[in-house]
């Protein structure tokens, strides 16, 4: 009798341990990436590049190519891709990149040991225009529960779900992803911008997408909230549209130099100082989620302007936008800025792919 009870007890304990271990595995993908990002931050900040393996300054769609790798000898630690168009069921995204190729390159970079981030520029669900169709103030309202286009947007979110569900490694485990929806929402150029919806509507939009994906089992997403460069934003203003500490893992900043160098440096430091204080006090990661100087008219920009500012803050990574024939933000072989880019990434605190491999 006693032996029988002991056997049953041991069996139940073994079953409980198995269930708990399975639960840990199922819930740990996001946390594993968060822990990895925190550990890497001790060594410096990673370099990232948007659409790195798809096209460059002088080439397009050739497999195995990368302007960054051909310039520096290594891939970026972080690669960024965009899902704009997936909501419509399109075969290609808003930059004409086939979604099948995005999936292929995303998984390849994960296998290399790199980190991937996804943004999403969905079309305007009210007018059918682009993400930059920003003339209406009722678009967000129309897709929230009870809104005219809520059912349509549910279908759009399902298309995002379907793409994300196919991002699995060789062991059929979900690939960890930094997910960065609704970026630059403090600006007024997207239909989800500050002049296009109220803070309450924006919160509801964020929660609707996040709750939907969590309900579908996507616990592999590190959620990034990334407003645009302001230069005069207080913590109170930042918090007006911030979804909340329980909904954000990584605080980002999109910060391009469109004006003078002096203005850029002043604005970048003002915003990063405020965001650093908040991130440190609230246990959040911090990154420059988009940045760059279009076409790099000043080749020394990497080492003379950008890096001295980044060195002042506890950043996880910085990501420059894409290289294309009509515009480029990263290095390319033969360009004058390549020398200064290589000088920057050879610094001990700037991490490329080889520096973060497990």
Language model regions located:
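Bacterial Sec-dependent N-terminal signal peptides
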Residues: 1-27
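N-terminal module-boundary/linker segments of secreted carbohydrate-active enzymes
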Residues: 26-78, 84, 92-96, 306, ...
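Alpha-helical scaffolding within the catalytic cores
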Residues: 31-33, 59-68, 100-104, 160-163, ...
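Substrate-binding cleft of secreted/luminal carbohydrate-active enzymes
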Residues: 45-51, 284-358
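Aromatic-lined carbohydrate-recognition surfaces of secreted/lumenal glycan-active proteins
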Residues: 48-50, 180-182, 206-236, 283-297, ...
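Acidic-and-aromatic substrate-binding clefts and catalytic sites of carbohydrate-active enzymes
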Residues: 53-61, 86-100, 228-236, 256-269, ...
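Aromatic- and acid-rich polysaccharide-binding/catalytic face
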Residues: 81, 238-265, 321-323
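Substrate-binding cleft of extracellular glycoside hydrolase catalytic domains
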Residues: 88-218
């Amino acid at each position: 009798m006693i032996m029988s009870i002991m056997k049953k007890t041991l069996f139940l304990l073994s079953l409980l341990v198995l269930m708990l271990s399975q639960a840990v595995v199922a819930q740990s993908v996001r946390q594993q990436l968060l822990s990895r990002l925190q550990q890497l931050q001790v060594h410096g900040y990673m370099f990232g590049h948007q659409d790195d393996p798809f096209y460059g300054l002088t080439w397009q769609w050739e497999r195995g190519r990368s302007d960054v790798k051909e310039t520096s000898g290594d891939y970026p630690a972080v690669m960024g891709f965009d899902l704009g168009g997936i909501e419509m069921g399109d075969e290609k995204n808003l930059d004409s990149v086939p979604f099948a190729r995005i999936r292929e390159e995303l998984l390849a970079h994960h296998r290399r040991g790199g980190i991937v981030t996804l943004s999403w520029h969905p079309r305007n669900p009210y007018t059918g225009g682009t993400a930059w169709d920003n003339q209406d103030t009722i678009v967000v309202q129309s897709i929230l529960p009870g809104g005219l286009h809520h059912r349509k947007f549910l279908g759009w979110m399902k298309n995002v779900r379907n793409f994300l569900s196919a991002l699995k490694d060789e062991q059929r485990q979900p690939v960890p992803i930094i997910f960065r929806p609704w970026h630059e929402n403090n600006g007024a150029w997207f239909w989800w911008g500050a002049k296009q919806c109220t803070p309450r509507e924006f919160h509801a939009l964020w929660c609707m997408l996040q709750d939907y994906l969590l309900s579908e089992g996507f616990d592999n997403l590190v959620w990034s909230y990334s407003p645009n460069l302001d230069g005069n934003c207080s913590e109170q203003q930042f918090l007006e549209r911030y979804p909340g500490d329980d909904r954000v893992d990584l605080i980002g900043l999109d910060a391009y130099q469109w004006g003078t160098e002096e203005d850029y440096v002043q604005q970048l430091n003002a915003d990063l100082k405020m965001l650093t204080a908040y991130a440190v006090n609230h246990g959040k990661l911090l990154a420059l989620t988009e940045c760059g100087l279009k076409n790099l008219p000043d080749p020394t920009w990497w080492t003379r302007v950008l890096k001295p500012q980044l060195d002042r803050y506890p950043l996880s990574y910085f990501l420059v936008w894409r290289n294309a024939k009509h515009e480029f933000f990263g290095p390319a072989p033969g360009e004058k800025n390549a020398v200064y880019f290589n000088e920057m990434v050879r610094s001990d605190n700037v991490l490329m792919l080889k520096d973060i491999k497990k």
